[in-house]
Amino acid sequence: MQKLNRSFKISNEIKKKISWIICYQLCDPRLFNILISVSSVNLSRDFSYAKIYVSILNNKNISFKEILTILQNSSKHIRYLLAKGIFLRIIPTLHFCHDSSYVNGTKITNLINNVLYNK
């Protein structure tokens, strides 16, 4: 149980730090005016690998795949900045994934509204 609690605390701390890094320290002009939110972080058992789920609100004509590619290409720099801000023996390798839960939730809400109001 203690291992799970530690894993939860570390993943939350990594989530906070990566959110801050993406928002304030990642200076890629292609990511300006794009809201990137870190939804969750899944760590491997030995904390050497982290899967980061991001939600993206896009005002530009950039696809989700392009944004994820930009983040993945910047993952070494993000990992370096993460190592400066968090004190762990092993800083995990970062892998970014698109979190589609917001889009799926919106679709389900629209379907429910259509059923309820279009009788």
Swiss-Prot record:
**Gene responsible for this protein:** rbfA
Q: What is its main location?
A: cytoplasm
Q: Which PROSITE patterns does its entry note?
A: RBFA
Q: Which InterPro entries match?
A: KH_dom-like_a/b (IPR015946), RbfA (IPR000238), RbfA_dom_sf (IPR023799), Ribosome-bd_factorA_CS (IPR020053)
GO biological process annotation, one example: maturation of SSU-rRNA
Family membership: Belongs to the RbfA family.
What sections of the protein cross the membrane?
A: none
Per its record, how is this protein called by name?
A: Ribosome-binding factor A
Keywords assigned by UniProt? Answer: Cytoplasm, Ribosome biogenesis
